């Protein structure tokens, strides 16, 4: 099994390799494949039931598992979810490695992995993983207000 310290730079290098061989569109196709095979089974099931509230339930679990420094809010009266990643462990690790040049759109995989699934179930993307520099980003969705299952 590969450790996360090895996986993250390998993932970044893979994106670079795919783009050099087949172009940027091939990288996006790769991300779509990852979305369908790995992200959809978890996020899709939650979003089908909870709509925009799935954002809270999904990321409150996954971001804590990754030990990310983040702040997120969800208003179950207005259906507005907002998140600020103050420090993404993946991007941060890449930026700290002196021997690695991060793939130029490394953070782009988040836009492709998550927003399309949430939008299928009524969440509207207001800010799709806008990179803010220094391993941070912001994203926001709104939709029909529903309570979260794991407050």
Task: Locate the predicted segments by residue.
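N-terminal accessory segment detector
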Residues: 1-108, 119, 124-138, 143-151
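Short amphipathic alpha-helical segments
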Residues: 113-114
């Amino acid at each position: 099994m590969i450790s996360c310290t090895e996986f993250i730079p390998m993932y970044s290098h893979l994106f670079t390799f795919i783009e050099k061989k087949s172009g940027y569109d091939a990288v996006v196709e790769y991300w779509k494949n990852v979305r369908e095979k790995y992200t959809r089974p978890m996020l899709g099931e939650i979003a089908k039931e909870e709509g925009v509230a799935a954002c809270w339930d999904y990321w409150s679990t996954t971001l804590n598992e990754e030990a990310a420094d983040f702040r997120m809010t969800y208003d179950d009266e207005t259906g507005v979810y907002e998140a600020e990643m103050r420090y993404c462990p993946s991007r941060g690790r890449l930026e700290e490695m002196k021997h690695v040049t991060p793939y130029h759109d490394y953070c782009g995989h988040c836009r492709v992995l998550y927003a399309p699934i949430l939008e299928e179930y009524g969440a509207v993307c207001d800010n799709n993983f806008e990179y803010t520099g220094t391993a941070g980003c912001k994203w926001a969705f709104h939709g029909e207000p529903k309570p979260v299952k794991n407050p």
